[in-house]
Each structure stands twice: as C-alpha cells, then as structure tokens.
Amino acid sequence: MFGFFNRAKKVGKGPTAVTGAQAVRSFGVAEMGRELSPWVFDGGFSNVEIAAALATIRTRSRDMQKNSPQFSQYFRQFKNNVVGRGFTLRAQPCEAVGDPAIDEAAKAFIQYHFWKWSKDRDEVDLTGRKSFARMCRLVAENWARDGEGIILIERNAPTVYGLQLRVVRPDALDEKMNGQGFTANTVIRNGVEIDRRTKRPIAYYFNGTAEDPMAAWYNSKPYVRVPASDVIHIFTQHDECQTRGIPLGHASLKKAKMLDEFDLSELVAARDEANTTGIFHAPADREDEIKKLNEDTAASNYVCQKSEPGTKYVLPPGWDYDPKTPQHPNREVSSFKNSMLRDVASGLGVEYACFANDWAGVSFSSVRAGTLAERDNYTTLQDDFVEMVVAPVFKAWLAQFLTRTIANPYVPSDFARLCEFEFQARTWAWVDPMKDVQADAIAVEHGWKTNEEVTAQYGGSDFKENCARLAEENAAKKQAGILTAPQITKGEKPGKEKDEGEE
C-alpha cells in the first residue's frame, strides 16, 4: 500500500516523459555549499577542546583586564553586581526536623555568629587578608575573567569557629591532566577526578612542587590530590560532561582585542598627523640644499621650525611648503566603534550604555529596558554564586561551628534542623524610585506581593526585624515628644497640608 512513495514522479507528456528529481527535505544551515564551507564543525564545550584552548583564552582574558578599558569596566561591574557588599544570611532553623515552625532564638544566634565570622579576616581567610565579602568578590572576578573560581576549605582550623578558606588561582588546576583515576571506578578529566558512572567530582589535582610532602607524582609531575569535599569550584557549565570553565567573555574577546588595536592605530595616526604640520619641497636639481641646510645649524631653521600662532614661514628662493591637513581622527570612528562595542556588550550580557559609558541619545525607556534585561542576567548569576559558593561555605561553617563550645547549647546532632537557610543577594535602586515604590505599595495592597518580598528588594533587610526596630523608634519618639510624620494618602502630593475641616 506504500508503493506510491517508491514511484518517481513523471514530468511531461507521452512516451518520452522523463523522470523528475526528487526533493529532499533538510536543514538549510546544514548545507555544505560554497557560502558555508568555511563554517567548520564544532564539538561544543568538550573536555578535549577546553584542555587545548583554556590556557590561551585565560591568559588573553587576563591581558584584557589589564589593558582594555571596556573589559576592565566589565569585570568591575560583574563583581559589584553579583556580589556587591556581600550576601545576607536568612537562617530558617526549625523547632524539629519536619516541623515548619521557626526557632527564633536559634535563628538570631546563628545569624549573629555567621555575621561575626564573615567580618573577621583572620577567621575567614587563611592568609588573613580578606573578609568573606571581599573573598566572594575575588572569586566572582576569577569566575568572570578565568572562567572558574576555586576555594579550598580548611576544617579544624586553630580559630574560634574552626573554619578557614583559601582562594586558589584556577591555573593551579592542570587542565591538561587526563588519565586513570585513583581507583578503577574513577577517571581524571582536565585535572578533575570524576566517577565514571555518575560523573560526580571525587578529587582535584593541583600543581605541586617537588619539595611538597603532600605531592604525588603523576606523568613525571608533582600534584596534590584534594578531595572534592574540601574544594568549592564554581564555573558556568555549557556541556553535561564539562569539568572546567572558560572565561565568560570568550565570545567577545577577539572582537574587543581587534577594536583595541584599531583604537591604537587611529590614535597613533592622529598623533602623527598632529605633529606633522607640513612638508618642505626643494626646487628641481637643488635637492642637495636640504643636506646643506641640515648641516648648517642656522640655516636648518628653514627646514625645522617651531609652530606658533600667527607666524609664517620664510623660505629660500624657489622652495615650496605643502601644509598637511589632518585626516585623523576620522569622523566615522565614533559610529563604527559604538557598533563594535554593542556586539561586545551583547557577548558579555551587559547593558551597552553603561558598559561603553556612552549615554548619547539614550532615553529613559531604553535605559530601563536594557537595565531590566541586564539585571535578570545578574540575578541568575547571583543564584548560581549562592548555590555553588555561599551555600557550601555556610554548611561547612555550621558543621564546624556546632563542634565548638561557643555554639552551646547547640550540638552537632542539631545540624539537620539548623541547616535551613536562604541568602539574600544585593538588590538595585531604580532610576525612578518613587513610581516603583508606589507600584510595590499597590502590589502589597492587592496581595500580589508580600511585605517580606518588598522588604527584601530594598537592601535585603528582614520585614519582622524592621517591624521590631520601628516599634522601638516609635516608642523613643513618643517618649521624646516627637510627632510621627503624617502618611501620604492616594492622590496627595508630599508636603501638601490639609485645610481645616478637610477630610
């Protein structure tokens, strides 16, 4: 019954009809014609490709941070928007495992001690240089610039809380190390030992030195094997089997570098033309006079003179002077550069105007739309950072904290019920805050948002804590005889007083 599909279509009439060509459905982008022949096959973000290219991309990304104004701005924006002043802990310890009731005493206790630990550089950093917020900013910068951030956890440290952290440069983890793992069930991929079946990280191999007593030799190189439980490794995963990260700006690096070189060439050309005001021409058959003028100090003033306003050149008989009009900087440079920077900003996922510091022709609506898209991207990055860095650090800190006498009356067996938490990342103020505050007030009034959600948007504070503080402030005002400012009703402008008898 399906023989119809096997018959070729006849084109034309009569016995001399010819068989027509059969149409084949296919993706146009998969064609291998002349136009697309330079488009080579790409295997994606495979471990093999990353091992071959990571070191080069990473060093070039670091160079751009040093020498490119735009990329320096991007890395600064990245760490300030992802981390900012740090993350605020919102502990949610329950009375018992499975009980939704919050243990308020334990909540205040845990939040206070974690805040105290995170502010103390000697407690947080093995080097004693960074608080937890500063360490997070450094890790975020490494994540953007090098493609990954790495922290080693030092448990049972000789400190009050027993936990210290150490930031490690990503290039200390050898991306070219591949082979058999520590056991038959593991394999090493780009310096990371993973389980063959689950692909879960088991250990990390860091470059060691021959004098390091903890180093083991592998392929004639010393390495230090660190269990995955003691390593915090953040990177953006583009492939399921990917074990290492690549710089987040990899798609824009090439164009940004070429644009920097173009800028330099344009600047050199402009400077050269600015320094060359004109050219002297000797008459025919008298070119030897140039040599004589160069030998005679007094006469050489004809050839090389200082350019001063209102002065004219006095030339020997027969000589000529050709003034040069600078052609650089080219009038089209600005529009061309802005177009290229838009592509670079798109590859970085940032808003162009702020990235390029170009606010010409920008309207409020366009800034708002671009800012919203950029903040959506940063919000996702904040979630990733909390999930991969901040949350594991807190869990490790809490486990160590409960083993210390400072944690009394809480003990290690309370870990399960106390390890309920969330972290509030930094938020942003709006360009027109009055309208946004009014919109939030309407949302709360109609039940579209809660006071807790709105409070979290403004600095990450806690609504219940705000209520307690407001109660204390109102009591203090009442005791001091200070009247509370009247509330503004709908349709009333700030500062407008009601007339007597007006309701």
What are these regions (language model features)?
Residues V231-G370, V411:
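Extended, charged amphipathic alpha-helical segments
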Residues K130-I153, P329-V431, T484-A485:
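C-terminal amphipathic alpha-helical
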Residues I110, K337, L341, L470-E473:
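Short amphipathic alpha-helical coiled-coil/interface segments
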Residues I153-R155, A269-T277, F355-W359, E452-Y458, ...:
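Short coil/turn segments at secondary-structure boundaries
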